[in-house]
Amino acid sequence: MMETMPNWLMQRAFLTPDRTAIEMEEEKVTFMQLHEKVVSVCEHLTHVGVKRGQKVAVLMKNGMEMITVIHALSYVGAVAVLLNTRLSREELLWQMDDAEVICLVTDQDFEAKDIPVYSFAEVMNGPKEEASIQEEFSLKEAMTIIYTSGTTGKPKGVILTYGNHWASAVGSSFNLGLRDDDCWLACMPMFHVGGLSLLMKNIMYGMRILLVPKYDADFIHKALQTRGVTIISVVSKMLTDLLERLGEETYPPSLRCMLLGGGPAPKPLLEACVEKRIPVYQTYGMTETSSQICTLSADYMLMKVGSAGKPLFQCQLRIEKDGVVVPPFAEGEIVVKGPNVTGGYFNREDATRETIQNGWLHTGDLGYLDEEGFLYVLDRRSDLIISGGENIYPAQIEEVLLSHPMVAEAGVVGMTDDKWGQVPAAFVVKSGEITEEEILHFCEEKLAKYKVPKKAWFLEELPRNASKKLLRRELRQLVEEM
């Protein structure tokens, strides 16, 4: 098994120098131009003291600057600690302290007492110094640290190596196939692994990326119609927004894949996509698996509604309960293994030991396999509602709520109940006139009695993170305040 590889972007710039690497609304950059920009950033970062093996925090929004910084850190051999721009100052300071970073590179106003903060513009306007550029990458070396959302307790820094990122891109290419004319529309934040993984695929495949700095449904919809996009990564909310804009039209046949992540998609949404001939590939993955680890191809979209598919070619997956592998249709914890799976968390030996056992990663997600080995993700274990001893999966109730024509968005969490321990409570964004009573009655017709929400509240919008995933922990806080 190989232990080193040529520096990815340098190799790509050597192989296909004039091919378009990144396209933005008004700008195009070839792989050679990207390499030259990265070398320049590298020399500026070297001047401010960034060296091989150090950890550097990156707090930036999607854009050419962020892309060049991420690559420049790999050129120097430093580890990029990617920070979520939507976090509070306290949360960011905590993560930087936890990751033991030597400095922060940012395009935002940010002050920190104990860590040097370098604005990207200042660094680039400052002096340069000859950089010691890594012409080879060791696949065992850490490339990035990304903090998990921390649905329970403090977030943990997931260490992803060059080997993890390489395996993820290879697995994805086996799964989706590669074409010379591929163009992946990138609108996911690059501080999330889903967005970051596109940067890796971009240079490894030699594939054009259409970069959208921030989520803009109108621009994305238009780009899918006119910019030759073949693949886009989405979550359910984005897919719903795009379908609304599509109306009676269809997207060009060149759009060959919508990669849907971020949790199970409601059935009515998938049915609408089939009607519009939109090829949706449902996926399952997490920071710890360097993006997707399971995918359901569009061939099975309706035959296996709600399934996240089968593992990527070099990955394995099983369902365990109390440490024992369970038969088909038995519910348990999803456990995965593969070369794209992290070796552990930074400075968290206990959490690493608890999560990774004999090379198998215990995801904390609940699911089951059908008789053909297709995975069905039920929910995060931490989101499970246990009511009078019965397991209730919020995703199932949300799917029912979303099938109502007057419901635009839905989120379900557990609410403390004296009799049952917990009961479901729903939060709804309306798309038309509907009352709480009508919503609860609608659920009564479609769900077992114990699964019917005890209460439904209306919100203008649901709390979501930067990649548009529903933040149930914030809904739980709202329940406590109600």
Curated annotation (Swiss-Prot):
Its EC number is 6.2.1.26. InterPro entries: AMP-bd_C, AMP-bd_C_sf, AMP-binding_CS, AMP-dep_synth/lig_dom, ANL_N_sf, MenE. It is an enzyme of class 6 (ligase). Pfam families: AMP-binding (PF00501), AMP-binding_C (PF13193). PROSITE patterns: AMP_BINDING (PS00455). It catalyses: 2-succinylbenzoate + ATP + CoA = 2-succinylbenzoyl-CoA + AMP + diphosphate. GO terms for biological process: menaquinone biosynthetic process. Pathway: Quinol/quinone metabolism; 1,4-dihydroxy-2-naphthoate biosynthesis; 1,4-dihydroxy-2-naphthoate from chorismate: step 5/7; Quinol/quinone metabolism; menaquinone biosynthesis. CDD domains: OSB_CoA_lg. Belongs to the ATP-dependent AMP-binding enzyme family. MenE subfamily. This is 2-succinylbenzoate--CoA ligase.
